[in-house]
Curated annotation (Swiss-Prot):
Protein known as: Glutamate 2,3-aminomutase
One Pfam family in the UniProt entry: Radical_SAM
Record-listed E.C. numbers: 5.4.3.9
MF term (GO), any: iron-sulfur cluster binding
Positions of [4Fe-4S] cluster binding: 164, 168, 171
């Protein structure tokens, strides 16, 4: 064996040892694709209680109209203590809750701290939060017309509805949810589109809510067709969690409609590997096959995914279903959600771990939204240790400090011109 091979093998063994802890931890992380049998059993129980059929289950309109919104029905499906039942009713008077039959089937009924349960079912902690701010992003002050939110020079949001298939307990717009579903009228949306048409610097439009995909196909198509007619709008993004909470929404008809209005992007919101199931995988693949790029915007949530192994597993599983991890958001300080908050140090520790320990494709950007509409602020661990006049000291993903030459760029155009002279 030559020296190069010996060193290479030693290095390979060293690298292999660095992944042992994740391989062991991964075995303990619940993943939806590996829980198909248990999910199906719960599905059958839910169908029996709701008097539904397999055909009903696969129909998103049935899923939406049969969201579970009362404690009595919920307690027939998952185990709830007497106190939990009382708390859910009490919280529901202030902060609405509803959960699609599909998403409910993902909950382990016996696990009081099941991550899917924490994401979707109210807890009394929501009422113990003394924070007063329901709009920490200051969105009410960034609404120049219609149902627009504008915080950046060349892009904006159209909030088309307050409806969702499931109301996340950490929702940043819970102030808009109320107790009744309400899509924005054509007049309000038209006002928003007219504003975009009149402001030629707008090139990127995000259609969201609520959940944009709770709108029917024809209403969504009208919005997309209007935006497509505006020359300076380069592309449209749709914000939706239905891929996670109601994947039946992604029909062949819907995908064929989107094809007419490319480039269309979809940003979705997986927070835990348990949410990646056979059904959500099929929904993502349908969209990807229809030419729709998919990006995931996770939120760092205490007790759900503020763990380096869980986040690594989530991002790697997302790539397998053709969803690019795009952002990890620091949770926002919205009233009733304080128990989900983690420290920025937690986020930086996760980002530090991901770098080098998984491929760049599986590493999203860690984002903190500055309060009062300050916008997205990306955060990274510090890899630049120091800087001299002609060098930098870098910290590698393994923590090694290495010196690298760093000189100013030459004037390449001047150099080429000088060399070309006779």
């Amino acid at each position: 064996m030559n020296e190069q091979t010996r060193i290479s093998l030693e290095r390979a063994a060293e690298l292999k040892s660095k992944i042992d802890d994740y391989i062991q931890a991964r075995k303990t992380i619940n993943r939806g694709l590996e829980k198909e049998e248990e999910i199906n059993k719960r599905k059958q129980k839910i169908l029996s209680i709701l008097n539904g059929t397999e055909e009903d289950w696969n129909n998103y309109k049935w899923q939406l109209s049969n969201r579970i919104t009362d404690v009595d029905t919920l307690s027939k499906i998952i185990t709830l203590t007497k106190k939990e039942k009382e708390y859910i009713k009490e919280v529901g008077t202030q902060f609405r809750w509803a959960i699609s039959p599909y998403y409910l089937s993902l909950i382990d009924p016996e696990d009081i701290c099941d991550p899917i349960k924490l994401l979707s079912i109210p807890t009394h902690i929501e009422l113990e939060d003394e924070q007063e701010d329901l709009d920490p992003m200051g969105e009410e002050y960034t609404n120049p017309a219609g149902c627009i939110t504008r915080r950046y020079p060349d892009r904006l949001i159209i909030n088309v509805t307050n409806e969702c298939a499931m109301y996340c307990r950490h929702c940043q717009r819970r102030r808009n949810i109320g107790q009744q579903d309400s899509h924005k009228s054509k007049a309000i949306i038209q006002e928003s589109i007219d504003y975009i048409r009149e402001n030629e610097e707008i090139r990127d439009v995000l259609v969201t809510g609520g959940d944009a995909l709770t709108l029917k196909d024809d209403y969504l198509e009208w919005i997309l067709s209007q935006l497509k007619e505006i020359p300076h709008v380069d592309y449209v993004r749709l914000g939706t969690r239905t891929l996670v909470t109601m994947p039946q929404r992604i029909t062949d008809e819907f995908c064929n409609m989107l094809k007419k209005y490319h480039p269309v992007y979809i940003n979705t919101h997986f927070n835990h590997p348990m949410e990646i199931t056979k059904e959500s995988k099929e929904a993502c693949e349908k969209l990807a096959n229809a030419g729709v790029p998919l990006g995931n915007q996770a939120v760092l949530l205490n007790g759900i995914n503020n763990d380096k192994f869980v986040m690594r597993c989530l991002n790697q599983e997302l790539l397998k279903i053709r969803v690019k991890p795009y952002y990890i958001f620091q949770s926002k300080h919205v009233k009733g959600t304080k128990h989900f908050n983690t420290s920025v140090d937690d986020g930086l520790e996760i980002m530090e771990y991901l770098r080098g320990y998984t491929s760049g494709m599986a590493i999203p950007t860690y984002i903190v939204n500055a309060p009062k509409g300050g916008g997205k602020t990306p955060l990274l661990p510090q890899y630049l240790v120091s800087k001299g006049t002609d060098y930098v000291m870098l910290r590698t993903w393994e923590g090694k400090v290495i010196k690298m030459e760093d000189e100013p760029a030459v004037d390449i155009k001047k150099l080429i011109k000088e060399q070309a002279q006779d």
